[in-house]
């Protein structure tokens, strides 16, 4: 694309359809059942995506790890999803271009925050489902009473204040309101970042760097 446009601003804006055509082709590979391509993997992926998209999670023997992995991928790419929506919105908006300066209010002020929040909401619901499964099952010392799943759900819930305060900051009118929203956003970001860092190090990676088990 950059070789075709030579990096010239006018050409980049005029040919905004080129980078988006790749995205449409990628989606088509997943959705259109081409006979020349293997269908088993695509079918399995779409089934998992359908289950995960509503916050569902399979049993351990039915692919629970894959559901968690896909939901975590969606969480990691939440910002990318929001940016893609903005690009598509600007592409179909008359007088705008998807390769121009991003207009994050395109399509309304609530859609992008909702797109950012959905992946975290999916993982939050999955954690709650896992907690309820532990509560219904006979007690096992290896799984405990399910508190770890609630703590994991709390980790994903800390993303919501970040998204809400960021949206409020974008809509704030006046320096005082912007300063207050910025401080609230900064506190929310710090809580989310430190909680996520602690959880990843001690739980997901099983490191003792931040625990009392660390050897001196």
Where are these regions (language model features)?
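Alpha-helical, bilayer-embedded segments
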Residues: 1-215
């Amino acid at each position: 694309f950059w070789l075709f446009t030579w990096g010239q601003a006018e050409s980049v804006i005029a040919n905004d359809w080129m980078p988006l055509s790749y995205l449409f082709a990628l989606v088509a590979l997943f959705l259109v059942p081409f006979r020349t391509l293997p269908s088993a993997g695509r079918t399995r992926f779409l089934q998992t995506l359908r289950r995960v998209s509503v916050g569902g999670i399979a049993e351990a023997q039915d692919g629970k790890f894959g559901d968690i992995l896909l939901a975590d991928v969606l969480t990691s790419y939440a910002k990318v999803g929001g940016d893609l929506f903005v690009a598509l919105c600007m592409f179909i908006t008359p007088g705008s271009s998807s390769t121009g300066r991003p207009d994050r209010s395109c399509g309304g002020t609530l859609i992008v925050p909702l797109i950012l929040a959905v992946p975290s909401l999916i993982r939050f619901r999955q954690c709650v489902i896992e907690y309820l499964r532990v509560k219904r099952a006979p007690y096992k010392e290896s799984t405990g009473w399910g508190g770890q799943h609630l703590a994991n759900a709390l980790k994903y819930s800390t993303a919501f204040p970040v998204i809400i305060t960021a949206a409020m900051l974008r809509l704030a009118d006046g320096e005082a309101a912007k300063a207050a929203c910025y401080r609230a956003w900064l506190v929310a970001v710090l809580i989310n970042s430190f909680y996520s860092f602690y959880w990843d190090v001690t739980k997901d990676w099983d490191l003792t760097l931040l625990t009392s088990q660390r050897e001196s």
